[in-house]
Curated annotation (Swiss-Prot):
Family: Belongs to the WD repeat PROPPIN family.
KW Endoplasmic reticulum (keyword) present: no
Name listed for the protein in its UniProt record: Autophagy-related protein 18
Organism: Cryptococcus neoformans var. neoformans serotype D (strain B-3501A)
Alphabetical GO biological process terms: autophagy; protein transport
Sequence ranges of Basic and acidic residues compositional bias: 282-295
Described function: The PI(3,5)P2 regulatory complex regulates both the synthesis and turnover of phosphatidylinositol 3,5-bisphosphate (PtdIns(3,5)P2). Necessary for proper vacuole morphology. Plays an important role in osmotically-induced vacuole fragmentation. Required for cytoplasm to vacuole transport (Cvt) vesicle formation, pexophagy and starvation-induced autophagy. Involved in correct ATG9 trafficking to the pre-autophagosomal structure. Might also be involved in premeiotic DNA replication.
Keyword set includes Glycosyltransferase: no
Length: 423
């Protein structure tokens, strides 16, 4: 998540770029771009004004900015600016009907997330291609693959209960329901089609992450005790990991660039790193593994290939997901009815989700955190709402507790002086 708790008096937001080589920081006077290794400032602008969202496009000079000043039209949270930091110029400005909650980019698409809508733009022309009506998503939970070829978008699917029936054509359409289920809708931003609805959890989705190649999706619910990894786009469950037995608020999930490790941070003092390459895969066994939130083994991973084409450049997530849910529900119900009576309740406990491979113990009151893994050295990087960047060494052979190697402040007194260096 890019928006962090405001524990540092000047920090408004902080996030890694797509390959975890840089950090984008928004603060009360503007924004700063930092290099991770070696750590250091690359660019700063202290004349921008309060900046709530800063999103980079890899290590290029293209940066998306969203203001954080409700009473200043030039720095409104409804205003998105695309700027070139090297030329110190504004490429375009867009105004939205409500506050922009998140911005995601890859080399083909720019995604703008509002509470009830997602806008998809062609990043080369900034032409609006598509609008998705999502229903309430106040935490802007979504993920965009950094891959240009598999430019998939994942977000919570506002799906009604499986037993609900569609409205008749004469009925007054109801607003999209809140995402009270743990379903995730997978959308192809290149073909502009819905691909799949994944029944990931039983409670609402709290965090999502797609790997760099767009082939895996990691999910966590608002209960925060289990993390699942699915293949994309066919939605086969690959792994299931136990974060802990008590509930926790998940702050961030990130794959490493090789998709062999998965890091998860939460409101607890422990950051978990899971190994993907050697863990026992989920498949059939892990479907019932979680005592927290396992779902019935319905064939929920049915592609939306048979769905009608989208009309008017707009996707109603409610309708698309409802169609899929009705098909999968009836088939799944008959399957469960046939075999459910033969399975003892304790069977679900036989397939305990995998525990972490390595972990980090954070010191003191760390606030909100974002975790990522370096692509160049065996290190786990953590940025926090305290305004700190920390790098921990990880033993890739044996795992265990990671050791703190270096720590830097994201903001210093020089951030509120003059001077700016382009990327």
């Amino acid at each position: 998540m890019s928006r962090l708790a405001k524990r540092h008096p000047d920090l408004l937001s902080c996030n890694f770029n797509q390959d975890y080589s840089c950090i984008a920081v928004g603060h009360k006077k503007g924004y700063t771009i930092l290099n991770c290794d070696p750590f250091g400032k690359v660019h700063s602008n202290n004349d921008q004004g309060a900046t709530g969202i800063v999103e980079m496009l890899f290590c290029t000079s293209l940066v998306a900015l969203v203001g954080a000043a409700e009473n200043q039209p030039s720095n409104s949270p409804r205003k998105l600016q695309i700027v070139n930091t090297k030329r110190q110029s504004t490429i375009c400005e867009l105004i939205f009907p409500t506050s922009v909650l998140a911005v995601k980019m890859n080399r083909k698409r720019l995604i703008v997330v509002l509470e009830n809508e997602i806008y998809i733009y062609d990043i080369s022309t900034m032409k609006l291609l598509h609008t998705i009506e999502t229903g309430p998503n106040p935490n802007a939970v979504c993920a965009l693959s950094s891959s240009s070829e598999r430019s998939y978008l994942a977000y919570p699917s506002p799906v009604p209960s499986a037993s609900s029936t569609p409205l008749s054509s004469s009925a007054i359409p109801a607003p999209p329901p809140a995402p009270t289920t743990g379903d995730v809708l997978l959308f192809d931003t290149i073909s502009l089609t819905a691909l799949n609805v994944i029944q990931a959890h039983k409670t609402p989705i709290a965090a999502l992450a797609l790997n760099s190649t767009g082939t895996m999706l990691a999910t966590a619910s608002d209960k925060g005790t289990v993390v699942r990894v699915f293949s994309v786009p066919d939605a086969k469950k690959l792994w299931q990991f136990r974060r802990g037995s008590s509930s926790a608020r998940i702050f961030s999930i990130n794959f490493n660039l090789m998709s062999t490790l998965l890091a998860v941070s939460s409101d607890t003092s422990t950051i978990h790193i899971y190994r993907l390459a050697s863990s026992r895969k989920g498949g059939k066994d892990a479907d019932d593994a979680s005592t927290e939130e396992a779902r019935s083994p319905t064939p929920s991973e049915t592609p939306l290939a048979s769905s009608p084409p989208l009309a008017g450049g707009k996707l109603d997530s409610h309708s698309a997901a409802s169609s899929l849910r009705r098909r999968s529900y009836h088939l799944g119900k008959s399957f469960v009815g046939g075999v459910g009576g033969y399975l003892p309740k304790s069977v679900s406990e036989m397939w305990e989700p995998q525990r972490d491979f390595a972990f980090i113990k954070l010191r003191g009151n760390h606030g909100r955190t974002v975790v990522a893994m370096s692509a160049t050295v065996p290190q786990v990087m953590v940025i926090s709402s305290e305004g700190l960047f920390q790098a921990y060494n990880i033993d890739l052979e044996n795992g265990g507790e990671c050791s703190l190697m270096k720590e830097f402040a994201l903001l210093g007194s020089e951030d509120f002086g003059n001077g700016s260096n382009g990327i």
